[in-house]
Structure formats: C-alpha cells, structure tokens
Amino acid sequence: TITDPILFAPPSRIVEAAVVLIRDGVPAFGSKRLVTLQSLTWTTLNGLLVGFALSIVTGLLIGVLLGRHKRLARVAEPYVDAIYATPRVVLTPLIVLWFGLGYNARLFLVWLGASIPIVINTAIGIRNARPDLEEVGHSVGMSERQLLRHVIMPGAVPYVLAGLRVAAGRAMIGIVIGEMFLNLVGLGGFIRFEGARLRTANAFVAVMVLGIMGAALISSLGLLESKFASWKKEERSRET
C-alpha cells in the first residue's frame, strides 16, 4: 500500500537518507567502499554534460550537411528517423558488445539520444532560412562558408535551440538507461541497486537529484531560447 515504508518512504526518512549520503556515504554496488551523494552526482553529471556536448557538435555538423544537401538528406533521413524511433533500451546488448561496461557506453547512450533531435531541428532551420537574404548574399559574392555564418545559421538558431531542449530531455533518459541497465556507478545505477535491496529512501534521494538535474538543464536552455527570442524581437523593432 501507499503507506508501506518499503514502497513509499516518508519525507522524514528521505531527508535522513540524504543527510547520511551527503555526510558519510553508504556501501553500494556490491562493494564495501562508501559512496556519497556528491560522488554519484558528479559521475552522472560528467557523463551527461560530456555526452551532451558531443551531441551538440556532431548534431550541428550533420544537421547543416542535411539542410544544405538535398540528395544527402534523401538518403540519410530515413536512417535518422529510424534511429530516433528505436528505443535505446533494445540497443543495450549491442552497446555492451561495442563499448563494454564503462564510461564509453554511458557516453554513447547520451550521444545517441541527444544528437538526433539536434540533427533534425538544425536541418529544418537551415532549409527554412530566408531565400531572399541568401540570394542577396550570392549576388554580393559571399562564399558558402560566409552564407552559413552570416545569413543561414542566424536564422536557424531558434530551431537549434528548440532542438537542444528536446535533446536535453533525451540525454537525461540516456544517462539513466545507461547507468541502470549496464549497472554503472552513478545515480541511475544507485537507484537500481538500492531499489533491489528495498532501501527505498536512498533510491528516492537519487531520483530527486536526477529530477533537479534535468529540470535545471532544460530550464537553462529554455531561458536561453527566450533570451534569444526577445533579442530578435528588439532587432526587428530597431530595423523598422
């Protein structure tokens, strides 16, 4: 039942568990070595941010290529859509074969989930760039690189930022899947380990930290998106 402390730890137990995890740590992952909430959070955050950064770099590059080259897009986009629609959980056995049980597997799951929304949104933004401005750029002798930098990419920024917000959520899912299903050290692995041993309060602490982490990442990207939108609005008002 909902009042069962094993199934639903009361707030007082969760607070006590958080204090112990922060101050002393607890033995976990089948080892006598104590792990603290800080070390678990840093491990997960490190994998999340590094994987997300890699997805931004590769997602932007691939998105620009697909947005500027229609033939390449016709060939590649069905594969992109298939990867986007495939649940990452079913790829876990293959990822273990490719990368083993370690840091690289964690990074790959984050990258795989986060890069595809960035690719899709960047490609859409590139295609929706204003053709009149592009024609003006061609008429004054701008190179492809100059067009991308000064004309096309500025117009695609709102699409890219929207893609980053979606990607952030998928990156969080990727890091948790990686840690839980590959039994990796981190908040996700800690939730699985503690839950299996009916230490519900400890598991709830890790769940709450993951929720705060995800909300902070997505909210910061949303703030960046709104700042850019207000800046563009001011630019248009000055032009008129």
Question: For the regions a protein language model found, what residue spans apply to each?
Answer:
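Hydrophobic alpha-helical transmembrane segments of polytopic membrane proteins
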Residues: 188-223
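Short cytoplasmic-facing helical segments at TM-TM junctions of multi-pass membrane proteins
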Residues: 118-163
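Alpha-helical membrane-protein architecture signal
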Residues: 15, 34, 38, 42, ...
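Generic hydrophobic transmembrane alpha-helix motif, especially the helices
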Residues: 77, 81-117, 124-125
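Transmembrane alpha-helices
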Residues: 108, 112, 145-178, 205, ...
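Short cytosolic juxtamembrane segments of multi-pass membrane proteins
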Residues: 225-240
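Transmembrane-helix boundary motif in ABC transporter permease subunits
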Residues: 50-80
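Periplasmic/extracellular loop-to-transmembrane helix junction in inner-membrane transport proteins
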Residues: 1-53
